[in-house]
């Protein structure tokens, strides 16, 4: 088995490739989640507008949206933010320095303290 010597260049290339792969995976998962959320939101708004045909059009420049639709969009934005917060706190990551599982919302503060103390 032939192994290549570890140099700064190979180490930097390896770290860079790992970072790029993780960023691509995270972006892909986020995009897929957003697409699923938006499609379910569209399905629910379509069913609401079909059931409520007597909606009044708000006088907001004549863009054709009802006040119910505007409220629904605002509510969905608030719900999306709360979903993101719940996902952030319910997802755990393993600290490579000390080996503990840390909640996503606390990971940045943990890793800075953990690296300061050099726990292992």
From Swiss-Prot:
Keywords: Activator, Chromatin regulator, Metal-binding, Nucleus, Transcription, Transcription regulation, Zinc, Zinc-finger. GO terms for cellular component: DUBm complex; SAGA complex. It is found in: Nucleus. Residues 40-82 are annotated as: Disordered. Its main location: nucleus. Disulfide bonds: none annotated. InterPro entries: SAGA_su_Sgf11. One of its GO terms (biological process) is chromatin organization. A zinc finger (SGF11-type) spans 93-114. One of its GO terms (molecular function) is zinc ion binding. Residues 40-60 have a biased composition (Low complexity). Component of the 1.8 MDa SAGA transcription coactivator-HAT complex. SAGA is built of 5 distinct domains with specialized functions. Within the SAGA complex, SUS1, SGF11, SGF73 and UBP8 form an additional subcomplex of SAGA called the DUB module (deubiquitination module). Interacts directly with SGF73, SUS1 and UBP8. Functions as a component of the transcription regulatory histone acetylation (HAT) complex SAGA. At the promoters, SAGA is required for recruitment of the basal transcription machinery. It influences RNA polymerase II transcriptional activity through different activities such as TBP interaction and promoter selectivity, interaction with transcription activators, and chromatin modification through histone acetylation and deubiquitination. SAGA acetylates nucleosomal histone H3 to some extent (to form H3K9ac, H3K14ac, H3K18ac and H3K23ac). The long N-terminal helix forms part of the 'assembly lobe' of the SAGA deubiquitination module. The C-terminal SGF11-type zinc-finger domain together with the C-terminal catalytic domain of UBP8 forms the 'catalytic lobe' of the SAGA deubiquitination module. This is SAGA-associated factor 11. It comes from Candida albicans (strain SC5314 / ATCC MYA-2876). The gene is SGF11.
